[in-house]
């Protein structure tokens, strides 16, 4: 069995749950099985946005981020449900606990995906046998499908898990990158967003192989440090270890300030709030992180303190976005009394390259 496990190197899994929100709803309500199901921000409004949908819905052409009215036009029988984030988080924790029965080296990177280092798991079987076992247990115990990428590093494992959906298993070795990875368009590369892709295409860098062959200085000029990183990844390299503690260190990133004098003037509070948003954005940038929960803390003149949070349907990191949602929370929950302290925290933060961006529902 050790022939599957290198003496020098790693065997990494990327476990990616398929259509997670929709799959949870179907698992909880078996009557939905086989039906086109979509999760949308506000099913009662035509302008709602599809957050995710089942593969039955995708067969009609329904896609994530599509407007609800357009989705219903394509699929009149579409079953549309509101997102139940507390339930999704609960199921997510159950999934990660199941993965930890195989190895303690499990690194959750979002609510529905995780890396696993199974290098020391040769006693449990071959990597393929372990992947099949994980898929079977998730289906038998939770009725949830997943795709698994198997590779020598995190980047290749992530790319592999995207290649066969739903419920697929893909092995992506370094020697496979020329035939399996390089022909893919740059938009499919883990870590390349829409803005980066547009810059690259202007320089006739159209697929992952082009990134691998591109001049390093050009990539650095176009994309900064991330350009160098992308070239290394396109060549099949990724030194990052699977770190179970990584999720803990990124749980919350925030900034707060106690005013020398209590503030009751709204315009003055907005200036302070803007400064805090800038501080948080700077800290997120330093950690190359994003988050999908904004929390505002207000401490009044009499030391009474409230904290209010807003769960978003997309990850944010910019000062403008942080300020926008923080101001919304302030307007909703400030009682008009003098404020002594304000604080903004981004919770559920993740590494920017480890999340899948979704269009905001708002």
Question: Where on the chain are the PLM-derived regions?
Answer:
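DNA-contacting surface of Y-family translesion DNA polymerases
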Residues: 5-7, 14, 188, 198-341, ...
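Extracellular/lumenal ectodomain signal focusing on beta-strand-rich modules
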Residues: 113, 341-343
């Amino acid at each position: 069995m050790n022939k599957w496990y290198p003496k020098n190197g790693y065997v990494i899994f990327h476990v990616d749950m398929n259509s997670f929100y929709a799959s949870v709803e179907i698992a909880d309500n078996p009557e939905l099985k086989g039906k086109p199901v979509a999760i949308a921000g506000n099913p009662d409004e035509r302008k709602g946005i599809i957050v995710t949908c089942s593969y039955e819905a995708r067969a009609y052409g329904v896609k994530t981020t599509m407007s609800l009215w357009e989705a219903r036009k394509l699929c009149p029988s579409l079953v549309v449900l509101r997102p139940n984030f507390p339930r999704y988080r609960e199921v997510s924790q159950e999934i990660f606990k199941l993965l930890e029965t195989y190895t303690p080296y499990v690194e959750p990177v979002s609510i529905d995906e995780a890396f696993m280092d199974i290098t020391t798991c040769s006693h449990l079987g071959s990597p393929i046998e372990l992947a099949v076992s994980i898929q079977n247990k998730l289906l038998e115990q939770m009725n949830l499908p997943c795709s698994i990428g198997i590779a020598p590093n995190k980047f290749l494992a992530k790319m592999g898990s995207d290649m066969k959906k739903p419920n697929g298993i893909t092995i992506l070795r370094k020697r496979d990158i020329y035939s399996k990875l390089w022909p893919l368009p740059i938009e499919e590369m883990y870590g390349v967003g829409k803005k980066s892709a547009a810059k690259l295409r202007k320089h006739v860098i159209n697929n992952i192989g082009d990134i691998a062959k591109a001049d390093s200085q050009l990539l650095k000029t176009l994309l900064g440090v991330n350009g160098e990183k992308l070239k290394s990844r396109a060549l099949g390299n990724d030194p990052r270890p699977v770190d179970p503690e990584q999720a803990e260190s990124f749980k919350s990133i925030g900034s707060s300030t106690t005013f020398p004098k209590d503030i009751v003037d709204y315009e003055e509070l907005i200036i302070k709030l803007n400064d805090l948003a800038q501080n948080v954005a700077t800290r997120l940038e330093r950690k190359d992180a994003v988050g999908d929960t904004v929390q505002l803390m207000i401490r009044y003149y009499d030391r009474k303190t409230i904290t209010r949070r807003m769960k978003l349907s997309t990850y944010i990191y910019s000062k403008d976005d942080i300020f926008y949602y923080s101001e919304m929370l302030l307007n909703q929950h400030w009682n008009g009394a003098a404020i002594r302290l304000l604080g903004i925290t981004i919770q559920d933060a993740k590494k920017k390259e480890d999340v899948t961006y979704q269009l905001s529902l708002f």
